[in-house]
Amino acid sequence: YVRMANGPFGCTAFAADVFARRIVGWACATTMDTGELPLQALEQAMSWAASHGGTDGLVHHSDHGAQYIGLVCTTRVGEFGMLPSTGTVGDSYDNAMAESADGAYKTELVWRRKPFQDLRDLELATFRWVSWWNSKRLHRSLGYRTPERTETEYYANQAAQAAPL
């Protein structure tokens, strides 16, 4: 939850690629409605995945929050050809990557500034933070590389291995 100047709290949902830690989908709203927030982040992630090899065989991992295991979200995951996966209840390690990204978002953006003026202000700040996260922020889990660099190196290596001798 994110503090807003006009009273209600804002909420942000992220979808990330586990391999490169890239945030591939995100959305902000003033409610955690299952028909809005997580689905918007999922739709963005699926658009990104479709342009990077497709969605078949991908796994959508989430916690047991009602917004993620509800019929609307699980139906959409299935329509994309993805496999649903949820963590075990009461196990904080099962969703550690998501918790880490959420913690970084709050530490690096949310708690460093005054409350957001409105939803548009939150969305703009989140857009800038996600762009920075993917292209500039060094991640210890990636050997102090950015998600973009990790992907670039991976695809260059794949192309080199596929090239004829």
List where the protein language model places each region.
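Charged DNA-binding/catalytic regions of mobile-element recombinases
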Residues: Y1-L165
